[in-house]
Amino acid sequence: MNLKTLRGILETDLSLLACPRCGQSFSLSGNSLRCAGNHCYDLAAKGYVNLAPQHDQSREKYDAALFESRSIVLESGFYAPVLDAVGSMLDARFGNSPFVLADAGCGEGYYARSLAQRFPAASVIGLDLSRDGILAAARKPGSVLWLVADLKQPPLAPGMTDVVLDVLTPASYDTFRRVLKPGGELIKVIPDADYLKEIRQAFQPHLRQESYSNGQVLEHLSRHAEILERQEVHQTLPLTTEQSRAFLQMTPMGFSVPEEVRNTTTLEQITLHLQVIRCRLNNKAE
């Protein structure tokens, strides 16, 4: 995305944003966003806005190599059933009508970009604290507004978002409540028991848990939201050598695993087991 395209998107969707430091609305001043409190954020020539310039990117584990591996996996179609499930939920509710979707923790932008293509009337915002992720997202053409942003204090105006999409990212329910419109919804994608079980088995000596359960995540979700719909994705697929390497490099399970182990492990297949959950947040946590 170039600067001209970014400016065009901002001219249309500027009312959806708010300054992350003071909460006031933005105006577009040249190639910068400026709020009434005089906080200023420059538009990057590569097609995004960094609204978390204070974040130390050098300590970010979600780096360019990880997002390159994720792109290999995602563009190979492994997560297409998840995208299809999210798309069907949005289609049932909005059809061809306009709506605002915020992809919280968008990474390299696979879901946000794909949904913007499927729903051209929608305003889609992709947010991630990793600049490398947003850089990877902004390299590809499209109509998504890409923002480097802290998800605990996102630069979104209160009550302006129809749907928050949260894919494999820790949820900040109080924040989601603030940015969602009345009646707005959260679509949350969480792992289930067999998710990437081949990687867990290969890395087992270096992991704290032998198995995974989403029980605590679901319990926490149920305290904050009414579950409206749930779809399960469960499939095991063969891998090429390149795809095996990409899966091993992209998962946070590998953060605690020695690089030598990650580089010498090869997987013949991978299991994807996820829950796609559409829900409406309670007015407050119970």
Q: What kind of region is each of these model predictions?
A:
Residues 142-154:
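Conserved SAM-binding strand-loop segment of SAM-dependent methyltransferases
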Residues 128-131:
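Conserved SAM/SAH-binding beta-strand->alpha-helix loop
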Residues 108-120:
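Conserved SAM-binding loop of SAM-dependent methyltransferases across substrates and taxa
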Residues 183-194:
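Conserved beta-strand signature within the Rossmann-like core of class I S-adenosyl-L-methionine
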Residues 7, 58-82:
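Class I SAM-dependent methyltransferase Rossmann-like catalytic core
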Residues 13-15, 231-286:
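Conserved Class I S-adenosyl-L-methionine
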Residues 97-107:
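Conserved class I S-adenosyl-L-methionine
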Residues 1-58:
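N-terminal auxiliary segments of SAM/dcSAM-dependent transferases
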